[in-house]
Amino acid sequence: MAQDVLTDLNKVRNIGIMAHIDAGKTTTTERILFYTGVNHKIGETHDGASTTDWMEQEKERGITITSAAVTSFWNGNQINIIDTPGHVDFTVEVERSLRVLDGAVAVFDGKEGVEPQSETVWRQADKYEVPRICFVNKMDKLGADFYFTVDTIINRLGAKPLVIQLPIGAENDFVGVVDLLEMRALVWPGDSKGDVTMGAKYEVQEIPADLLEKAQEYRAALVEAAAEASEELMEKYLEGEELTVAELKAGIRKLTIASEIYPVLCGSAFKNRGVQPMLDAVVDFLPSPLDVPPMIGHDPRNEETEMTRKPSTDEPFSALAFKVATHPFFGQLVFIRVYSGQIASGTQVINSTKGKKERIGKLFQMHANKENPVEEALAGHIYAAIGLKDTTTGDTLADITNPIVLESMSFPEPVISVAIEPKTKGDQEKLSTAIQKLSAEDPTFRVNLDEDTGQTIIAGMGELHLDILVDRMRREFRVEANVGKPQVAYRETIRRKVEKHDYTHKKQTGGSGQFAKIQIAIEPFTSEEGVLYEFENKVTGGRVPREYIPSVDQGIQSALTDGVLAGYPVVGIKATLLDGAYHDVDSSEMAFKIAGRMAFKEAARKADPVLLEPLMEVEVRTPEEYMGDVIGDLNSRRGQMQSMEDASGVKVIRSLVPLSGMFGYIGDLRSKTQGRAVYSMQFDSYAEVPKAVSDEIIQKARGE
């Protein structure tokens, strides 16, 4: 049975489940696994027993950190699900899972509507053009309002929702949904307490009389929207003919795959209502690997040559590694999405990103943290592979005789760091193992050595991110270490162009000396793609031999790691090599590298250097009576108010606040609002630090 499904890609769906931190995403995934027969006992996040949350910290904190890939079957279709974390510190996990998905289910909290993190994840899905259906969850919750949530999809996301279900009853009285396609009511009858037993089937009933008019109105809108999918449907619709359910589904599917509309369903995953129709919608409306455009990549031997791979087993093998995880028995597991061709376990492939040959040891289809071994990996599917030594997130694996490099993923720079000091020499060794493994798993986790203090500095996307990384070092790698206070990842840049700056590096110490002379220009530089540095060579007439030019570039880049103001990394620089001179005997790559480094340091001092700090977009939801205190407090943290609006009985305040002002904010907010306000924050951009604050940071960094 499973094998038949695997080869017919029309019946395969690779989907993600994406949402705000508490919209009930993991519970929804759990229910899907239950209904598709994979789990016999249901796991609840709040009991710490859910299948996809399998790391110890996830179970303790009740949040999903790593996206587990799980395979399940529904009515003869195969659904591969990636559960993505909703917490903003784990953006990298969301980014990389969206990159390999074909479609997604966006889960919203029926009371809160679109929350800040739902907005972030939605924008990421837009970036990768992932078609979505929406599931308005928690319809049994006090204050749940389906129609308000649909409005927030329009107003906050600027998206075009297409309602294909209406809720029957709300809060405690929520019993089922109206299926607008078939115009019928689906009701999950409860027991004496109103609870639905796990796996209970729904009953098909007549639409309740009080909802009939509303259902007809929404169905008319649905038919009109579906008719826009093709000229034939439009013609039929305009001539007043009835469109069949199959035609409506085909129209909605076409528009969903084109990301023109987003079908909206509703339910309560926790109360087991609405999950089966949502699975039907995944199959009906989300794309199969065959509906997605062919993958584009380039020839590893020549970046200019564009190549494509269709999702077929007849094409040469190509796959993208989108996640690395450490497994207790197998060591390193690499999750791959196979885009074309097929590969048997034990075969040699090439990591075309790094130009290294790799052997695929064993292949598995994953079930959260249970493995199901398979003999071969086929196009259109997601697998975990063991035995890959040099492959990290974003690398392409390809057929040795016909390699391709697929488009990789871009990850944000970390904004916060802590110093970590191992307690003993033995811990130092364990720490380096831990760092090596964790940075292979997580591209947003960075490590560097502070040369002045000898401390190891680890950097990440937020306090929770670093907490969990440190926690994993202690638990998984048994590292005993002292961890410093979180520090802000400041940056440095320049404001002014320096037209030309000369530097000569000369050293005479008996025998051959060192000589390099260069003239450089530096200027502020910004790029759309987030590139932080650019080097241009304008030397003519061989005044600097070609083999030394990369050394100048390397020297300048080495100077960018510690800026002239306070030793922070330098960004937003364009450097141009204008002229130079060399000596036949005394010039060397080393001499030009030193010249590049020193020339940049001197030029940067003349280029009006400034400090940059990360600004966070902070959103606070507070009852009105505390609004004044909350705003006053944000202002005292150098916050800049962006907007204020009302949402379901609370005030929503949006402000841009420097990260340095946000440490420990949660405690202060709780005490100011008696624990009634909640906030979320995410990185927005880097901005110049005001002079008074900047002077203080520089003095501290220089130890004055």
UniProtKB/Swiss-Prot annotation:
List where Basic and acidic residues composition bias occurs: 298-313
The record's HAMAP family line, in alphabetical order, gives: EF_G_EF_2_B
Q: What cellular component GO annotations does this protein have?
A: cytoplasm
PROSITE patterns assigned to the protein according to its UniProt record, in alphabetical order: G_TR_1 (PS00301), G_TR_2 (PS51722)
Instruction: Sum up the protein's function in the record's words.
Output: Catalyzes the GTP-dependent ribosomal translocation step during translation elongation. During this step, the ribosome changes from the pre-translocational (PRE) to the post-translocational (POST) state as the newly formed A-site-bound peptidyl-tRNA and P-site-bound deacylated tRNA move to the P and E sites, respectively. Catalyzes the coordinated movement of the two tRNA molecules, the mRNA and conformational changes in the ribosome.
One GO term (biological process) = ribosome disassembly
**Top-level taxonomic group:** Bacteria
Location(s), subcellular: Cytoplasm
By its UniProt entry, which InterPro entries does this protein fall under?
A: EFG_II (IPR041095), EFG_III (IPR009022), EFG_III/V (IPR035647), EFG_IV (IPR047872), EFG_V (IPR035649), EFG_V-like (IPR000640), EFTu-like_2 (IPR004161), G_TR_CS (IPR031157)
Q: What Pfam families does the record point to?
A: EFG_C (PF00679), EFG_III (PF14492), EFG_IV (PF03764), GTP_EFTU (PF00009), GTP_EFTU_D2 (PF03144)
All copies of the tr-type G domain together span: 10-290
What is the designated name of this protein? Elongation factor G
Q: Which gene encodes it?
A: fusA
**Key words, A-Z:** Cytoplasm, Elongation factor, GTP-binding, Nucleotide-binding, Protein biosynthesis
Family stated for the protein in its record: Belongs to the TRAFAC class translation factor GTPase superfamily. Classic translation factor GTPase family. EF-G/EF-2 subfamily.
Show the segment(s) annotated as Disordered.
Answer: 293-313
Q: Which organism is it from?
A: Renibacterium salmoninarum (strain ATCC 33209 / DSM 20767 / JCM 11484 / NBRC 15589 / NCIMB 2235)
Which residues does the record give as GTP binding sites?
A: 19-26, 83-87, 137-140
The Gene Ontology terms for molecular function here are:
GTP binding; GTPase activity; translation elongation factor activity
Asked if Transport is a keyword of the record, the answer is no
List, alphabetically, the PANTHER family matched: RIBOSOME-RELEASING FACTOR 2, MITOCHONDRIAL, TRANSLATION ELONGATION FACTOR G-RELATED
